[in-house]
Amino acid sequence: MSFLGFGGGQPQLSSQQKIQAAEAELDLVTDMFNKLVNNCYKKCINTSYSEGELNKNESSCLDRCVAKYFETNVQVGENMQKMGQSFNAAGKF
């Protein structure tokens, strides 16, 4: 790779950049988890509950909600990657 950053592959990240990237990824994962918990809780858990444990309906609802959330997240991620690749191939940034 040249000193101007052209040619030969991707530039190497410094340790600080790797730490920042890991922190950003952790923030994204934490945010996604919190949204998943909030959305599925609102959808599946009755606000006037009287039991300490989840009942069968709540448990099934939460299971389906989490599965749909992850499936949707994967589909959106794949579509975003395809869009990014097509923009890069067309020379748009």
UniProtKB/Swiss-Prot annotation:
It comes from Saccharomyces cerevisiae (strain ATCC 204508 / S288c) (Baker's yeast). The twin CX3C motif contains 4 conserved Cys residues that form 2 disulfide bonds in the mitochondrial intermembrane space. However, during the transit of TIM10 from cytoplasm into mitochondrion, the Cys residues probably coordinate zinc, thereby preventing folding and allowing its transfer across mitochondrial outer membrane. Its main location: mitochondrion. Changing residue 44 to S: Loss of function due to severely affected folding and the presence of non-native disulfide bonds; loss of zinc-binding. This is Mitochondrial import inner membrane translocase subunit TIM10. Heterohexamer; composed of 3 copies of TIM9 and 3 copies of TIM10, named soluble 70 kDa complex. Associates directly with the TIM12 component of the TIM22 complex, whose core is composed of TIM18, TIM22 and TIM54. Interacts with the transmembrane regions of multi-pass transmembrane proteins in transit. It is found in: Mitochondrion inner membrane; Mitochondrion intermembrane space. GO terms for biological process: protein insertion into mitochondrial inner membrane. It is a peripheral membrane protein. Belongs to the small Tim family. Mitochondrial intermembrane chaperone that participates in the import and insertion of multi-pass transmembrane proteins into the mitochondrial inner membrane. Also required for the transfer of beta-barrel precursors from the TOM complex to the sorting and assembly machinery (SAM complex) of the outer membrane. Acts as a chaperone-like protein that protects the hydrophobic precursors from aggregation and guide them through the mitochondrial intermembrane space. Compared to TIM9, it may function as a substrate sensor.
